[in-house]
């Protein structure tokens, strides 16, 4: 059975999506929008509790990777090419879980989601005024990846720090981040046709400005 895109779009009409590269301010903006406009908050990996429990290796092998992992050092030691492939394919495998979760939340309230749903699927299930792309220069998305206090990033940093060849592992992991946030992927976001906000590396605190810009794009304020 397949649910047609026009049906999904109807049931997702209260959902607003933010996607983009690392360190672009997605998590902060999603949180601010949820608080300011009484929206349901769906932060990064909001669907992971269900997908970890339900994903099947023969259907969603990349979503099952972490569940079957016995040593997180293997996670951070993967080749940059494999890490890039895994990240983007996990987003594609997880799209169905995200969509189902969002439909369950969005019947009576607006929802704001930090999403990994691929751009081509977003174009099918949503529209211009319900999607915003946030981008950062690669120097920020890679070099400052661990300059955040969120538990997932700090957990990975601790895993890397625990490796005997810590510096080599960190360099390998950063090469993976560079591939994930490469010019190729940056351009895919920038040229997607969706509304786009680019973070400037000038030291200014632009959180309120960016939040207002995206809220206006979403029609939450005039």
Feature names for model-found ranges:
Residues 18:
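Hydrophobic anchor at the beta1->P-loop junction of P-loop NTPases
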Residues 3, 177-222:
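NTP-dependent small-molecule kinase module
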Residues 1-10:
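Pre-Walker A adenine-sensing motif
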Residues 25:
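Conserved glycine(s) of the Walker
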